[in-house]
Amino acid sequence: GFKTVAKLSTQTFSRLFPKKSNWIVELNNWEEVKPKVEQNFKAHCYYFDVHCSKPPYYGIKDEGGELLAFARFTAVQWEIVRMPGKMGGFLTKTIPFIPFLNRIIRPKNHQFLVPDIVWSKNKDAQLLNELFEGVLALKNQHLILWWVDQQDSYYKAVQSKIKWGILHKMIGASPVDVVQKTQSTTTNEMKTPVFVSAIDMV
């Protein structure tokens, strides 16, 4: 049968007016980020680097050139037929007419960024906040959707320290089950977090 072996969070990061960061740099060399990616993600279940090894990446470097944070971002465009929940149909029709909120959610042309291989030195939440907001400003976007294992040590370290934005205040972080087909009748939970590649979620 099928077993739920892990749970992901659909974590939103939104800014109505994202602030530009002068510290954001574009990185085009997989070898520059590879050691940190493998150090932090290689032990994750389902880890593979077919997609995450393809630049560009966006990061933060200090004045000495040390890499302090980075992630890879995939630009996504969806059409939302119906929002979730009892009021979903109503919200889908009304959000385009609600000032400011319609910057973040545009049902007919819903654009956002999806990160993977998210990392910051010493699991620094302030660096991650700077990275996410700076990339939103750079890409002229207002929303990031980050799918990440709820048991991921990095996510657990930064979760309560990030200003996730107005959309998170409205809907929180939605859970997603990772389901695996198995012949065993026992629960087969993952012993390490699941590696989530952006391309698998969009």
Where are each of the predicted segments found?
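Amide-forming acyltransferase catalytic core, primarily the GNAT-like/NAT-type
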Residues: 1-111
